[in-house]
């Protein structure tokens, strides 16, 4: 069996490609079902965020499994395989294991050390289990990755002062305008990213903030989190009129198509009116054609890289500390992985000994008579089970703990010969 990951991220693909391969949560179930139906995919998990799409699989034939994922991605994105392939990365076993650890630890994020990714990996694990994509191997891998991510956050200072996509967008806005306090700011959307936007805008001095959202209740819940700030709430029907009176617009909605484009802005903006748009959504909320308007500037998540680069340089040493922790978690997973080879032998031995125990117990109880057997069966059964477990405990622990592959296989062969076991290897 092999673990493989195929995906693309902010490192390998521009936002125009990433938005075509964003799989929203309501579509995860059908995507897992389709991938799991392929003949060479035994387990599957999907991690989809604004900056990455990664598909993790367990497969007996890595080349075939990777080919099936690539075909799925081409069909989903409606991009030709040759065009798509240049944006994909493909990693096998040890590299795939280290990769998911780095992702969970925030070391592969656009914003080094950002905290949201750990929750997203947790969601990937939960949905993979819920929709029957994740079984024994990926379950262990994602549990180990979540442990790794938590260790990175608690045992290093990588999370202290780390910026997020939202804070990077606000920082970029601060670079582009002279004074945030003098700007009328609109946020489209009322989710977690929008909450972070409000938080960072207030910390940078913004005072006039409006939220436009489809659900008024959700927007009001967000506004209540900042009681010291008079935040205005507007329904979606007022979006364009609110934008027309604004200086800065931040977009963070779950829309799958652009909600702002050149035509819409032309209809409401005065001729000399300047406007800056910061789109942190993937798929994008703002169409690229708005940049054709003379006094309009639009920025997307890929434009945040310059801001993020400064953050990375100051945090490189912390990242190196985190890498050492990840190596420990990779080793822990690898020890477990290697122990899988012993599962069949141990299972066969247990079954054989259990069969003998049950047969001998039945003989003993029949000799003791029904009255005695009924009265003491539970005690005698517990006694025999305890003896069997204690006898088997040390050999099983020793077998699992053999680090050397050849030594472990010799131990298995010895057990199989001594106990006349019919065990076939399932893992190689």
Swiss-Prot record:
Positions bearing the site annotation: Important for activity: 99
Record-listed NADP(+) binding positions: 189-194
Keywords of the record: Chlorophyll biosynthesis, NADP, Oxidoreductase, Porphyrin biosynthesis
Annotated Gene3D superfamilies: Glutamyl-tRNA reductase, N-terminal domain (3.30.460.30), NAD(P)-binding Rossmann-like Domain (3.40.50.720)
One annotated GO biological process: chlorophyll biosynthetic process
KW NADP (keyword) present: yes
Gene Ontology molecular function, alphabetical: glutamyl-tRNA reductase activity; NADP binding
Entry EC number(s): 1.2.1.70
Pfam families per the UniProt record, alphabetical: GlutR_dimer, GlutR_N, Shikimate_DH
Active site: 50 (nucleophile)
Coiled-coil region list: none
Record field: transmembrane: none
Binding positions for substrate per the UniProt entry: 49-52, 109, 114-116, 120
Catalytic activity: (S)-4-amino-5-oxopentanoate + tRNA(Glu) + NADP(+) = L-glutamyl-tRNA(Glu) + NADPH + H(+)
InterPro entries, per database record: 4pyrrol_synth_GluRdtase, 4pyrrol_synth_GluRdtase_dimer, 4pyrrol_synth_GluRdtase_N, GluRdtase_CS, GluRdtase_dimer_dom_sf, GluRdtase_N_sf, NAD(P)-bd_dom_sf, Shikm_DH/Glu-tRNA_Rdtase
Associated pathway: Porphyrin-containing compound metabolism; protoporphyrin-IX biosynthesis; 5-aminolevulinate from L-glutamyl-tRNA(Glu): step 1/2; Porphyrin-containing compound metabolism; chlorophyll biosynthesis
PANTHER family documented for this protein: GLUTAMYL-TRNA REDUCTASE 1, CHLOROPLASTIC
Subunit text: Homodimer.
The family this protein is said to belong to: Belongs to the glutamyl-tRNA reductase family.
Note: During catalysis, the active site Cys acts as a nucleophile attacking the alpha-carbonyl group of tRNA-bound glutamate with the formation of a thioester intermediate between enzyme and glutamate, and the concomitant release of tRNA(Glu). The thioester intermediate is finally reduced by direct hydride transfer from NADPH, to form the product GSA.
Domain notes: Possesses an unusual extended V-shaped dimeric structure with each monomer consisting of three distinct domains arranged along a curved 'spinal' alpha-helix. The N-terminal catalytic domain specifically recognizes the glutamate moiety of the substrate. The second domain is the NADPH-binding domain, and the third C-terminal domain is responsible for dimerization.
Role played: Catalyzes the NADPH-dependent reduction of glutamyl-tRNA(Glu) to glutamate 1-semialdehyde (GSA).
Identification of the protein by name: Glutamyl-tRNA reductase
Organism listed in the record: Nostoc punctiforme (strain ATCC 29133 / PCC 73102)
């Amino acid at each position: 069996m092999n673990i493989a990951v195929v995906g693309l991220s902010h490192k390998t693909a521009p936002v125009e490609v990433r938005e075509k391969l964003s799989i929203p949560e309501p579509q995860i179930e059908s995507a897992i079902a389709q991938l799991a139906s392929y003949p060479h995919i035994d387990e599957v998990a999907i991690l989809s965020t604004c900056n990455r799409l990664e598909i993790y699989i367990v497969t007996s034939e890595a080349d075939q499994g990777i080919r099936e994922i690539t075909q799925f991605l081409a069909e989903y994105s409606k991009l030709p395989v040759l065009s798509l392939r240049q944006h994909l990365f493909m990693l096998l076993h040890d590299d795939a294991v280290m990769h998911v650890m780095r992702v969970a630890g925030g070391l592969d994020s656009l914003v080094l050390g950002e905290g949201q990714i750990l929750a997203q990996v947790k969601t990937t694990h939960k949905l993979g289990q819920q929709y029957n994509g994740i079984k024994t191997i990926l379950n262990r891998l994602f549990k180990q990755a979540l442990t790794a991510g938590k260790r990175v956050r608690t045992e290093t200072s990588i999370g202290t002062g780390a910026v997020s996509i939202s804070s990077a967008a606000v920082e970029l806005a601060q670079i582009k305008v002279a004074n945030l306090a003098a700007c009328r700011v609109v946020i489209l959307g009322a989710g977690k990213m929008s909450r972070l936007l409000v938080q960072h805008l207030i910390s940078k001095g913004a005072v006039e903030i409006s939220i436009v959202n489809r659900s008024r209740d959700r927007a009001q819940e967000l506004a209540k989190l900042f009681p010291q700030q008079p935040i205005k709430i507007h329904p979606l029907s007022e979006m364009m009129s609110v934008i027309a009176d604004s200086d800065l617009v931040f977009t963070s909605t779950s829309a799958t198509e652009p909600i702002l484009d050149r035509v819409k802005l032309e209809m409401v903006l005065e001729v000399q009116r300047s406007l800056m748009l910061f789109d942190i959504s993937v798929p994008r909320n703002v169409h690229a054609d708005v940049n054709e308007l003379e006094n309009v500037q639009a920025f997307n998540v890929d434009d945040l890289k310059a801001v993020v680069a400064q953050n990375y340089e100051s945090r490189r040493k912390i990242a190196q500390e985190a890498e050492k922790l990840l190596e420990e978690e990779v080793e822990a997973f690898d020890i477990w992985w290697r122990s899988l080879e012993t599962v069949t032998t141990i299972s066969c031995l247990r079954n054989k000994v259990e069969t003998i125990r049950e047969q001998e117990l039945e003989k003993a109880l029949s000799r003791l008579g029904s009255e005695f057997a009924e009265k003491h069966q539970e005690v005698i059964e517990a006694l025999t089970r305890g003896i069997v477990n204690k006898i088997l405990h040390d050999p099983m622990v020793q077998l699992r703990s053999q680090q050397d592959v050849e030594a472990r296989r010799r131990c298995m062969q010895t057990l199989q010969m001594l106990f006349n076991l019919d065990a076939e290897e399932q893992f190689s």
